[in-house]
A protein has these predicted regions:
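Terminal, regulation- and interaction-focused segments at domain boundaries
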Residues: 1-16
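Beta-strand/loop substructures that line and gate deep hydrophobic ligand-binding cavities in soluble
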Residues: 53-73
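Extended Gly/Ser/Thr-rich low-complexity repeat segments
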Residues: 22, 26, 59-64, 80-92
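C-terminal structural segments of small proteins and small subunits
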Residues: 70-106
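Amphipathic alpha-helical segments
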Residues: 13-29
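Short, low-order "capping/linker" segments at domain edges
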Residues: 104-118
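Ser/Thr-rich, low-complexity intrinsically disordered terminal regions
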Residues: 29-55
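A generic structural signal for beta-strand entry/edge sites
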Residues: 3, 42-46, 64-68
Length: 118
């Protein structure tokens, strides 16, 4: 499954992880066609974007000063769509702090599921 990572510099990584997870959990509650699986606690988060797109995002806010994002998709098109969704939301939520998301190849550590969430 193709995957990419991003390290987003921020003084408030836990805040942005929580906002992302709460936003998509709220979307799931409000729209029956967007039943995302969302889990988060202790500086880690997970969003499964099915049925909108076959892909997911894992987040880690445990490292000081950085929000680590790891996205995957069933194929390259799904990966690209998940990246666009996540980037758009992180940059919108972090507009006041000037957050930007730049994707690169996934590290082996992230691709092995070290988050301890689904």
């Amino acid at each position: 499954m193709p995957s990419n990572d991003a390290r987003v510099a921020t003084e408030r990584p836990t805040l942005y992880l929580t906002r992302l997870c709460e936003h998509f959990a709220d979307q799931s509650r409000r729209h029956s066609d967007q039943e995302f699986e969302v889990a988060f606690d202790e500086g880690k988060g997970f969003i499964d974007f099915a049925p909108v797109v076959n892909g997911s995002c894992r987040m880690d806010a445990r490292e000081e000063g950085v929000l680590i994002l790891s996205v995957s998709g069933i194929d390259d098109a799904a990966l690209e769509r998940v990246q666009r969704i996540v980037s758009k939301h992180v940059e919108r939520f972090g507009r006041g702090d000037g957050l930007t998301v730049e994707w690169g190849p996934a590290s082996e550590q992230h691709s092995r599921g070290w988050f301890g969430l689904p």
